[in-house]
Amino acid sequence: MNNTECLKTFKINGIESGYNGYFKLDILKYRHSLYRGGSSDTVSRELFVRGDAVVVLLYDLSKEVVVLIEQCRAGALMHAQKIGQNEQAWLLEPVAGMIDFQETPQQAGIRETKEEAGVEINELEYICQYYPSPGACDEILHLYASEIDASLLPEYAGFDTEAEDIKIVQIPFEQARLKLASGQFNVSSTIITLQWFFYQKLAQLKA
């Protein structure tokens, strides 16, 4: 352990609620150690309290397809409107969803796959976990993959009660790889899971 690591300490001085609805916004006040010694002044940051989520990339080795879901996403609406391209509000992503209280990431992945892709899975292969936006959000994404029989997939899925309107999209391996290499995917979980699949999973299978 070096000296820089020894200095990494912090103290949370207060947490105030800024908003408490479907999502939460807290105002976090804290101090932390400095690289050059001493402590920072009190830092105040608005923190989007979202909780952890799970992501599951589905694939079918026999059909040589990866499976993504397409849906209209609130986070993409404003940019799509700004550039005058409505279709840009529809994004291609792996199955994903929030992890419920007292639920493991694996349990959430199995549940979300049934809800969003209409198929049952029993096994998940761990990919990684990461913070998608650590400067303002506490969310951690837990990424997994699962092999399925793509012939069992419906064309559409989603719960009406959750305003979900989902299209199931099967993309041939080579087409998905080329889209990935040319920067045509614009969601971090899509990019990371596909990079793992093509450059680690398939590479191991071919070795």
Where does each model-flagged region fall?
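Acidic, metal-coordinating catalytic segment for phosphate/diphosphate chemistry
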Residues: 20-65, 71-79
